[in-house]
Curated annotation (Swiss-Prot):
Oligomer and partners: Interacts with PPP1CA; this interaction mediates the PPP1CA phosphatase activity inhibition. Interacts with RTTN; this interaction allows the mutual recruitment to the centriole.
Similarity annotation: Belongs to the PPP1R35 family.
Region (Disordered): 1-100
Subcellular location, principal: cytoplasm
Pfam families: PPP1R35_C (PF15503)
Assigned GO CC terms: centriole; centrosome; cytoplasm
Listed GO biological process terms: notochord morphogenesis; positive regulation of centriole elongation; positive regulation of cilium assembly
A GO term for molecular function: protein phosphatase inhibitor activity
Function: During centriole duplication, plays a role in the centriole elongation by promoting the recruitment of the microtubule-binding elongation machinery through its interaction with TTTN, leading to the centriole to centrosome conversion. In addition may play a role in the primary cilia assembly.
Compartmental location: Cytoplasm, Cytoskeleton, Microtubule organizing center, Centrosome; Cytoplasm, Cytoskeleton, Microtubule organizing center, Centrosome, Centriole
This protein's name: Protein phosphatase 1 regulatory subunit 35
Biased composition regions of type Basic residues, renumbered to the chain: 64-76
Disruption of the gene: reported phenotype: Mice homozygous embryos for the Ppp1r35 gene are lethal during early embryogenesis. Homozygous embryos are capable of initiating and completing gastrulation as well as specifying the anterior/posterior and the dorsal/ventral axis, but exhibit a developmental delays which are the result in the failure to progress past 8.5 dpc to 9.0 dpc.
Length: 260
């Protein structure tokens, strides 16, 4: 039993001796890095040695020996983002520093800074005894928007201008009659239609005219014939003359009337 216990103790001590981790692998020499970009745009990667996990320490001795032998070849590399470059901190401008241009503190129209400046001037005038109350009231009334509106109302009443025109001068009436809206829509639709051909105006119907042979006898008329040469007259050239379309129907009506 003692021998068996001694052998077991020796085997346990041997395992503990094997489980003692060796020195960590030496990191590579730092390579020259590229210039760091601006913060927010840094996408560079830097290698870092993989820390040994606690599970690797409890692994079998055979596996640990194999890892020690091939640590240089199969070592894992973890990449992480480079830390952002330090931003240059500019010294803040002191509010009360003399000789500085405070562009943001310039009093503007209708601003709280302008009102505070006027209040400070009024307090300084009261403290020095140069404050004129009547003049201040007159100046305020001259600048007041309410006073100007009330004055315009009074002038408009004196000129007999209706109150509706003074209040709603540039507004559009929303109570439009339905008939007016329909007429406007109908006019728009008609304007989009092509123009219709217009019918010719009706001519006045003429009555029966006088008889042309009332004062003459056709049998007593003399006829003249031209003295032609051997060649005779040159052949006439026929030329078409454009006539309006309504002349055809007018001629037809006249012939029917004469036949009757």
């Amino acid at each position: 039993m003692m021998g068996f216990g001694a052998s077991a103790l020796e085997s346990i001590e041997g395992e503990e001796a094997l489980e003692v981790p060796g020195p960590p692998p030496e990191p590579r020499a730092p390579e020259p890095r590229a210039p760091e970009p601006e913060p927010g745009l840094d996408l560079s990667l830097s290698p870092s040695p993989l820390p040994e996990s606690p599970k690797a320490r409890k692994s079998s001795p055979g596996q640990r020996k194999g890892r020690r032998g091939g640590s240089r070849r199969g070592r894992q590399v973890r990449f992480q983002l480079a830390p952002p470059s330090p931003v240059r901190s500019e010294p803040l401008l002191v509010a009360g520093a003399p000789g500085d241009d405070h562009e943001l503190e310039a009093p503007a129209l209708q601003s709280s800074l302008a009102l505070s400046l006027e209040l400070q001037n009024a307090r300084a005038a009261v403290a020095s005894g140069q404050f004129d109350a009547s003049k201040a009231v007159e100046e305020q009334l001259r600048k007041s928007f309410r006073t100007r509106c009330a004055l315009e109302e009074t002038v408009a009443e004196g000129l007999n201008v209706p109150r509706s025109k003074r209040l709603y001068r540039d507004l559009v009436s929303l109570q439009v009659p339905e008939e007016q809206v329909l007429n406007a829509a109908l006019r728009e639709k008609l304007a989009m239609l092509p123009p219709q051909p217009r019918a010719p105006p009706l001519k006045e119907v003429l009555g029966p005219g006088p008889d042309m042979t009332m004062l003459c006898n056709p049998d007593s008329l003399w006829s003249e014939s031209p003295h032609l040469t051997v060649d005779g007259l040159p052949p006439l050239r026929l030329q078409a003359r454009p006539r309006p379309s309504e002349d055809t129907f007018l001629m037809h009506r006249m012939l029917r009337r004469w036949e009757a």
